[in-house]
Design a protein with these regions (language model features):
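Bacterial N-terminal signal peptides
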Residues: 7-17
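Surface-exposed, glycine- and small/polar-enriched segments that build interaction surfaces at terminal
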Residues: 26-298
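Bacterial N-terminal signal peptides that target proteins for export
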Residues: 1-7
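Boundary at the C-terminal end of the N-terminal hydrophobic targeting segment
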Residues: 20-25
Length: 298
């Protein structure tokens, strides 16, 4: 459900783009695995040419493979770019006015949206690479299958699978898999792994190995590292915090092993320290379950 929410966010960002006609591409069943892209017919791709030798040089338009500089509007037959890939808009397989083009048969974000791998620098307004190895920069966002490197966006950075590296989004940074590294979102940052909760914000969940920073919320199913937010840090039921949580409201619905600092701290199982105006540790003796200023179980 978190993936569907990402799809809806993309639809909102694309308001007014209904003039883009849908063209169905081959489904991407596993964005984390590079698969050969079938040769599409001319109605599903844009024109292309390469200035150089073979696939090395400057690729203009919807080239399949380019080593060097690739300049393009939208992707259809694109498979791989080594170097700098500037693709301004979404693939031909995606009509942003139709949610069905952004979700798969299970209603989760993905579907036909992801095309090609960039090894190097991926640039665009709103682009959907299957994989980024290197740097991704977008106006509305790089929304990728997987990320290995650094991504920066004026709105959102999101991955359908794991986010490995650093992601910074003015609106948010999210992974529908795990976050291994650092994710910073102006509003929220979090991970939504298999078996996680539904929705966004406090209802998202996944595994965070590193640091997540969100203006209103930082969430995960498990956190090994740190969660920081002006609003809430949440670890879902059955999850574990191993490290640090700093926010106004730290809600650890599993086991806390480490330190939480906030106005209100809550832990189902505390094996660490809480510092705040009010501290709740449900596994403590009755007299020590709710304490001001400091609570601990070591």
């Amino acid at each position: 459900m978190y993936r569907k929410a990402l799809a809806l966010l993309v639809l909102l960002l694309s308001a007014g783009s209904g003039s883009l006609s849908p063209v169905q591409g081959e489904p991407v069943t596993n964005p984390g695995v590079e698969e050969p892209v079938p040769q599409p017919d001319s109605s599903r791709t844009g024109r292309s040419s390469t200035v150089g030798v073979g696939a090395v040089g400057v690729g203009l338009g919807d080239t399949e493979r380019t080593t060097g500089l690739r300049l393009n509007w939208r992707n259809g037959q694109f498979q791989r770019a080594n170097g700098v890939n500037l693709t301004l808009w979404t693939p031909y397989s995606v009509n942003l006015g139709d949610e069905d083009d952004l979700v798969d048969e299970n209603g989760e974000f993905g579907g036909d949206a992801f095309v090609g791998t960039t090894n190097g620098i991926a640039l665009g307004l709103l682009h959907f690479p299957r994989r980024i190895r290197g740097v991704g920069i977008g106006g509305f966002g790089p929304v990728a299958g997987t990320l290995q490197g650094v991504a920066v966006s004026g709105i959102v950075v999101a991955t359908v699978e794991d986010l490995n590296g650093i992601a910074v989004g003015a609106g948010g940074a999210a992974a529908a898999g795990d976050i291994n590294g650092i994710a910073v979102g102006g509003l929220a940052a979090g991970a939504d792994g298999p078996g996680a909760g539904e929705g966004t914000g406090p209802d998202a969940g996944g595994t965070v190995n590193g640091i997540v920073v969100g203006g209103l919320g930082a969430v995960g199913n498990d956190m090994r590292g740190a969660g920081v937010s002006a609003g809430m840090v949440r670890v879902r039921e059955g999850g574990t915090l191993k490290g640090l949580a700093v926010s106004a409201y730290n809600d650890i619905n599993g086991r806390q092993v480490g330190l939480s600092i906030g106005l209100y701290n809550h832990a189902r199982v505390l094996d660490g320290v809480q510092i705040g105006l009010l501290n709740v540790a449900r596994n403590n003796p009755e007299w020590a379950r709710i304490l001001p200023i400091l609570n601990l179980n070591l």
